[in-house]
């Protein structure tokens, strides 16, 4: 009883002290919190924290008054009128995000601006040094003209073919390569102590910074050399000094990571070789006499696609600019559908079907070859729509050089792919396949190893007949066919001009299904017709084809990288047996140099950090098919990629996300264990923990972005809309109004700059649209739709017949230059910007995971977890 009395007296004294010391406004604040529903634990915790803050800071005075008034602006998660128990943690997370992540900032940060100005000045000095060094290097080798910046392929706009060197230039290049390899071997194997390694890498780092600012072949090739040397030293160190063999388990994990790193190094070096001298080939002009132009057969294979999907392609093929007596369009229907035959007959296309449906698409094309006789064959997937200048852009090289068997053009898509759509990427950013179709193929062309991609290509019939038609031994018949053609001595070419565009896969699951087939097929080729062996190929051709196949074995290495830090967290296994200082001295430079060099190489074709997301999404799903193909290459069948669909509501594809969820759970557990070791271990290894925790955080960012891609966005339009800016005349009630067409699909157009008379049109009211394809003027009937806002209105097309529909296709889909695009130079593709973008995508992915958690009992859990995630303050929004 006396103990209870003493406690009551102590409580009374403390209460009296607080009432005497603390201002009346604080007591009123406590009372306000209580009336607004704050819980007792929240009152105790937040009251104690507020009391401590008042003791340290005079919060009731200026300038803290301004901070108090804007608390909700910068911390949207916090309600000052009704605090929650863990608001302090929310403030810490949001503060960290505002200080170190959020790129924007309120005005008035003069000190920060001064620091940034100093950094920019230092950067300009480094850039100037780099320019002087680069000019000095260029002057040394100025006699080898193709190495200079001015001779970079395609800069002059002239027609380009593979570079031809004189004997002296070849000799100089061979000597330089041999000396370079010897020097690289010495640099890679030369033993340094830790201080020597730091000095060497410092020199390499500043060399990289200087060279990265010079746009010339020589600077890029020197960056390749520096990257290979730095990464080579890292791997030499890994192989000779860091393999942990204390126990069998240690050896297993250590060797697993080392093998994954060796794979990544091999892909990196082969990639550098593949694109070290890209050829920007332009179309070659055709003979002026159109009578000598060759005959061309257009093949459009189809199996189970809808008629609406193939219509634009057939119309565009019929609209190709080519002599009518030398052009024949064929619809190859492996589905044997009467509606398709009737459509082909009505529009004037040929219709071919076969009794036996062997070997899928390859068999379909090979059968069509037996009943046609054109000198050249053009193959379009049924959703790939060519512009009318497709043949004018591609046939010139085939007519000029009788040894060219294949001319391939890049694959572009007019509907957003799952990455672009689900990650809400800017449409100006390069899409997932841009790196290969817009850049690597130009490198392949340099080495006469252009790969047939199954569509948007022209092939010489004589060459196809020589190799037995389209290859049927694997499920990637296109790449295998180009390999066979090169083995027989035929050449290939890649035209760097988008003259066709197709439909992307609508969902992530469809995309993964397509890539599984590609991965299986490429490994089948590796096993059945390995490019490293056999006759007919040059060494560069072998390396280019081998690298294409090696790429699809990234499944296991990528998974290893995603779990590599966990053995240390779970069982104190050192997968890199070295001190933390040595790891910093070797690992970080290896990562920085390879990342910067690849970014310099891929600028305009791949956004920073997204390669890891692309590979992570596919890694689990291609692992088993590629492994099976290595063991049993004849197993597997051709699957048709579904195209042309809608998505009624937004959802998270939990089934496709299961591998990512497992990896997220493992990394989160590892993260928790790591923090536990840091705070509660008697002798924590802080540097080692920092390295592994940083690795885990990066893995979680990649996995969070992967989850974002699995969130399927609504797609209400059955016919994708395509942007196009051309003038249009709208005739209503006998009056012609000038306007601008800004978007179209197969059945609709969107028109802006409408005057008041057109905005008042009733729904369904008929108008006449006058459009030009650049040469001819066409008139179409359309009906006003319900959508109208700010001088913009949709109109539904009402085609009188197939001829009118074909003419509309010529004015839109098949319009000359319709698909031609160039990388946007205004895109900010710096590493910091890319990292922030990756962070934002990952946050969106984790938010979506919580949002789409199944069940009705979890809303509170979702809201609670979401409240801890950082948010953009309203202060930033209003100032923007």
Q: What feature does the model see in each segment?
A:
Residues 3-14, 650-657, 664-880:
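Structured alpha-helical
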Residues 333-340, 356-357:
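A conserved acidic beta->alpha catalytic loop
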Residues 484-500:
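Catalytic donor-sugar/metal-binding loop of nucleotide-sugar-dependent glycosyltransferases
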Residues 274-278, 352-376, 387-475, 486-487, ...:
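Long helical/loop segments within the catalytic core of UDP-sugar-dependent glycosyltransferases
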Residues 315-326:
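Short, acidic, metal-binding catalytic loop of nucleotide-sugar glycosyltransferases
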Residues 295-297, 328, 480:
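Cell-envelope/extracellular polymer assembly enzymes that use nucleotide-activated donors
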Residues 3-292, 344, 554-558, 681-684, ...:
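N-terminal membrane-anchoring/stem segments of glycan-assembly enzymes
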């Amino acid at each position: 009883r006396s103990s209870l009395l003493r406690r009551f007296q102590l409580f009374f004294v403390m209460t009296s002290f607080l009432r005497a010391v603390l201002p009346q406004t604080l007591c009123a604040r406590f009372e306000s919190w209580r009336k607004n529903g704050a819980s007792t634990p929240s009152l105790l915790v937040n009251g104690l924290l507020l009391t401590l803050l008042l003791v340290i800071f005079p919060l009731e005075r200026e300038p803290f008054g301004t901070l108090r008034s804007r608390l909700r602006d910068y911390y949207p998660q916090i309600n000052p009128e009704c605090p929650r128990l863990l608001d302090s943690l929310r403030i810490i997370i949001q503060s960290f995000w505002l200080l170190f992540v959020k790129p924007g900032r309120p005005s008035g940060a003069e000190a920060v601006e001064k620091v940034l100005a100093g950094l920019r000045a230092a950067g300009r000095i480094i850039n100037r040094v780099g320019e002087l060094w680069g000019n000095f290097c260029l002057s040394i080798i100025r006699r080898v003209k193709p190495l200079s910046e001015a001779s970079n392929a395609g800069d002059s706009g002239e027609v380009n073919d593979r570079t031809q060197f004189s004997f002296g230039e070849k000799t100089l290049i061979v000597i330089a390569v041999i000396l370079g390899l010897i020097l690289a071997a010495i640099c890679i194997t030369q033993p340094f102590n830790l201080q020597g390694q730091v000095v060497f890498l410092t020199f390499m780092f500043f060399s990289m910074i200087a060279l990265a600012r010079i746009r010339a072949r020589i600077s890029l090739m020197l960056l390749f050399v520096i990257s290979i040397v730095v990464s080579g030293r890292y791997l030499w160190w890994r192989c000779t000094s860091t393999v942990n063999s204390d126990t069998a388990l240690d050896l297993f994990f250590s060797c697993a990571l080392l093998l994954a790193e060796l794979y990544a190094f091999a892909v990196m070096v082969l990639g550098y070789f593949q694109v070290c001298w890209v050829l920007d080939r332009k179309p070659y002009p055709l003979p002026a006499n159109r009578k000598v132009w060759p005959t061309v057969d257009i093949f459009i294979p189809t199996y189970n696609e809808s008629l609406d999907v193939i219509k634009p392609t057939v119309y565009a093929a019929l609209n190709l600019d080519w002599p009518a007596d030398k052009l024949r369009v064929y619809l190859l229907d492996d589905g044997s559908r009467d509606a398709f035959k009737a459509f082909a007959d009505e529009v004037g296309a040929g219709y071919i079907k076969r009794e036996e449906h062997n070997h899928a698409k390859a068999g379909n094309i090979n059968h069509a070859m037996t009943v046609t006789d054109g000198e050249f064959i053009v193959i379009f997937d049924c959703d790939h729509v060519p512009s009318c200048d497709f043949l004018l852009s591609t046939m010139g090289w085939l007519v000029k050089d009788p040894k060219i068997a294949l001319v391939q053009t890049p694959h572009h898509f007019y509907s957003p792919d799952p990455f672009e759509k689900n990650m809400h990427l800017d449409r100006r950013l390069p899409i997932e396949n841009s790196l290969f179709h817009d850049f690597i193929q130009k490198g392949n062309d340099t080495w006469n190893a252009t790969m047939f991609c199954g569509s948007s290509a022209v092939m010489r019939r004589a060459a196809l007949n020589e190799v037995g038609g389209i290859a049927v031994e694997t499920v990637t018949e296109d790449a295998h066919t180009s390999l066979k053609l090169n083995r027989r001595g035929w050449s290939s070419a890649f035209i760097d001009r988008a003259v066709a565009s197709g439909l992307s896969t609508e969902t992530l699951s469809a995309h993964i299904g397509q890539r599984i087939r590609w991965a299986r097929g490429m490994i089948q080729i590796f096993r059945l017709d390995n490019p490293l062996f056999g006759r007919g190929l040059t060494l560069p051709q072998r390396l280019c084809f081998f690298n294409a196949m090696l790429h699809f074995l990234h499944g296991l290495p990528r998974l290893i990288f995603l779990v590599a830090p966990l053995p240390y967290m779970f069982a104190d296994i050192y997968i890199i047996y070295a001190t933390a200082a040595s790891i910093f001295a070797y690992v970080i430079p290896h990562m920085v140099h390879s990342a910067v060099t690849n970014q310099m190489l891929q600028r305009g074709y791949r956004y920073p950090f997204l390669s890891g997301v692309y590979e992570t999404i596919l890694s689990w799903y291609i692992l088993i098919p590629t492994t099976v193909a290595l063991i049993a290459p004849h197993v597997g069948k051709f699957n048709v990629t579904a195209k042309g669909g809608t998505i009624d509501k937004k959802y998270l594809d939990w089934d496709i996300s299961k591998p990512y969820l497992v990896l997220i759970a493992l990394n989160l557990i590892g993260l928790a264990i790591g923090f536990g070791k840091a705070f509660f271990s008697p002798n924590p290894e802080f540097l080692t923990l920092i390295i592994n925790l940083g690795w885990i955080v990066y893995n979680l960012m990649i996995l969070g972005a992967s989850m974002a891609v699995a969130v399927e966005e609504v797609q209400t339009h059955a016919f994708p809309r395509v942007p196009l800016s051309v003038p249009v005349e709208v005739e209503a009630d006998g009056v012609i109004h000038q306007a601008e067409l800004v978007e179209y699909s197969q059945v609709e157009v969107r028109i802006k700059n409408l005057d008041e008379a057109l905005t008042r049109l009733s729904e369904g009211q008929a108008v006449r649209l006058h459009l030009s394809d650049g040469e001819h003027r066409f008139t179409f009937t359309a009906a006003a739709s319900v959508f109208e806002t700010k001088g913009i209105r949709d109109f539904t097309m009402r085609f009188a017949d197939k001829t009118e529909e074909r003419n509309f296709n010529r004015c839109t889909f098949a319009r000359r230059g319709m698909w031609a695009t160039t990388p946007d130079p205004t895109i900010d593709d710096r590493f910091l910007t890319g990292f922030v973008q990756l962070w934002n995508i990952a946050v969106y992915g984790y938010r979506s995971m919580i949002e789409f958690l199944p069940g009705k009992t979890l809303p509170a859990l979702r809201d609670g977890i979401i409240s801890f995630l950082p948010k953009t303050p309203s202060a930033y929004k209003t100032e923007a």
